[in-house]
């Protein structure tokens, strides 16, 4: 890789790192919704732009490790799950681009997979932390509210989870 492209890759890596550290830190600190959706979208754009500069083996994983290092130094209060998300995204993207599939298809796969990984990670963590009973309790709570307004009982969590996953999937397509 020539010096010009190396400089661009370093700048893109810095952009990714500082978006993870600063924007991610702010979103996590204020517990704002859709943190993973926003940060994953930015990560995908940065990773794809890095690959666009002429992908070489190990390039994305090196950028990922650098992003993790900067994120840990600047925003140490970030939950461990955020670091896991970045590492999984970087490793998966490295794998997809390493396969040598056509660039446009790789970008499409990377975008959808990164956003879906973010969605599933959140759902898995909620289930592990609160158990399956969490979803039953949510249904019970939402049905009690619905009954007050004269609506029947429905498994609302199924619809909420489906909406959440579809939102991430659609953003993955758009990104």
Identify the meaning behind each predicted range:
Residues 2-6, 56, 101, 106, ...:
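General structural signal for secondary-structure boundaries
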Residues 16-24, 43, 47, 67, ...:
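Alpha-helical transmembrane segments of multipass membrane proteins
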Residues 107-175:
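Membrane-embedded alpha-helical hairpins and interfacial helices in multi-pass inner-membrane proteins
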Residues 26, 30, 100, 127-128:
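Helix-loop junctions at the membrane-solvent interface of multi-pass transporters
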Residues 2-73, 77-78:
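Hydrophobic transmembrane alpha-helices
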Residues 48-55, 72-80, 95-103, 119-126:
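Juxtamembrane membrane-interface segments at transmembrane alpha-helix termini
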């Amino acid at each position: 890789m020539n010096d010009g492209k190396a400089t661009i890759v370093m700048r893109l890596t810095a952009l990714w790192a500082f978006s993870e550290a600063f924007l991610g830190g702010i979103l996590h600190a204020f517990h704002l919704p859709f943190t993973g959706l926003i940060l994953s979208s930015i990560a995908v754009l940065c990773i794809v732009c890095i690959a666009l500069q002429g992908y070489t083996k190990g390039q994305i994983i090196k950028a990922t490790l650098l992003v993790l290092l900067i994120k840990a130094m600047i925003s140490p209060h970030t939950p461990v799950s955020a670091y896991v998300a970045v590492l999984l995204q970087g490793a998966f993207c490295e794998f997809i681009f390493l396969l040598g599939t056509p660039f446009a298809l790789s970008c499409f796969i990377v975008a959808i997979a990164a956003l879906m990984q973010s969605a599933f990670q959140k759902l898995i963590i909620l289930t592990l932390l609160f158990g399956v009973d969490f979803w039953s309790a949510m249904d019970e709570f939402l049905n009690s509210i619905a009954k007050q307004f004269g609506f029947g009982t429905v498994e609302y969590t199924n619809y909420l989870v489906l909406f959440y996953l579809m939102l991430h999937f659609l953003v993955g397509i758009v990104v």
